[in-house]
Amino acid sequence: MEFVTKVVECVNTFLWDYALLVLLLGAGIIYSFSLKFIQIRKFGAGMKALFGNFSLHGGKGENGLSSFQALTTAIAAQVGTGNIAGAATAIASGGPGSIFWMWVSAFFGMATIYAEAVMAQHTRKLENGHYVGGPVYYIKYVFKGRFGKFLAGFFSVAIILALGFMGNMVQSNSIGAAFNNAFHVPKLAVGICVAVIAGIIFIGGIKRIASFTEKIVPIMALLYIIGCLVILVMHLPGVGTAFKDIFVGAFAPQAIAGGALGVTVQKAMRFGVARGLFSNEAGMGSTPHAHATAEVKDPCDQGIIAMMGVFIDTFIILTLTALVILSTGVLGNGQTGSELAQSAFNVGFGNFGNIFIALCMLFFAFTTIVGWYYFGEVNVRHLFGNGAVKVYAVIVVICVIIGSTLKVDLVWDMADMFNGLMVLPNLIALLGCLAIVRKLTKKS
């Protein structure tokens, strides 16, 4: 087991500290310039579609979801425990300046996720009365023959293991730990309850999943945003200092408290880009499964909507988490991850902070379980056919129960590894799709 742990750590170090940072950020930069910075040009249209066009909430066809349902299903997966723990880890390891580099990665990532959604729409198929799409479809579209089949199969195996099984174990563990800490409820009992409710949603397929996410995701986001804003109002003088530390720390971390912790510009950049990309999932190949299901007139319309998911995830929710941590003065107390975030909310809400974090963890992690289950399901159908879906659902439910009680350090590291491995075929395909995306964008 020690050998396995070391191998996983070495692979993750190579992938997440070096290779994927360059590839993911590079793909975002290439698409940004190629599409003439579509994340800026179409940002207003995206916001208008998200908040002003009520037809997004309706317009459900027989074969797909509304654009809003597809977006909330994607956000359900994007906004997870990483939005609480991820920002805290980045700040603790890379200093306040890491948040600036999170913004940079998200900015370029918006162009990448636009391309993913456009290609998912362009190459989707009608199967069993529902639209289905994702990286496996556009991988085989752009690469014919054995190479395309190999890349698609490799991606499917990686995402099933990374998200469907191991990733969902980690999410249920976060819920169990949070509720045990706040309410002293046994972790196993929490895991069983989560698994039962999740199983009921799984049985209903994509329609029930979408119906669930379109109701829960706005509530969950609003609850967390209000909680963060309340704390920021209570610590208003610290907000200005927080923004100053973010910008100074991005280029001169030694000039602030982070310098005493040995934080460098390279370290701030590495942790900011890594945690940002991992949280918003731009370029990772997960969210295209959701965006492929939307019934829209033009694939590029859903691409614009997809960009809003990255904006909400990183520029709103992750940023608010970071500001709460920095403005409450808990940075430097020796904690990291969710513990650091929890300390910040305890400063703002007292003992209610534990309860607030537990509720947020429940919403964030549970919706991620639902979203990740569906992404895995699409790939199970691709590899093994419809008959394997029930077996897959049972395994996921078991993983949710087991994950609630385990120490999941190795499981999380393995999920990171397979998550990284699934990015590689997706990025190869996206770079191969550059001319297609550019052509579709010009026509729209």
Give the residues covered by each predicted segment:
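Flexible loop linkers connecting adjacent transmembrane helices
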Residues: 37-65, 89-99, 111-146, 331-348, ...
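Transmembrane helix-loop junctions in multi-pass membrane proteins
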Residues: 3-4, 34-39, 82-87, 164-175, ...
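Membrane-interface loop-to-helix entry segments
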Residues: 23-30, 34-47, 155, 172-179, ...
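Alpha-helical membrane segments and immediately flanking helix-loop junctions
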Residues: 58-93, 122, 128-136, 140-142, ...
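Helix-loop-helix module between adjacent transmembrane segments
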Residues: 31-32, 105-129, 136, 140-173, ...
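Selective recognition of specific alpha-helical transmembrane segments in multi-pass small-molecule
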Residues: 108-116, 192-206, 217-237, 270, ...
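N-terminal alpha-helical transmembrane segments of multi-pass membrane transport
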Residues: 1-77, 81, 92-97, 109, ...
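Extracellular/periplasmic helix-exit of transmembrane alpha-helices
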Residues: 114-123, 128, 229-245, 253, ...
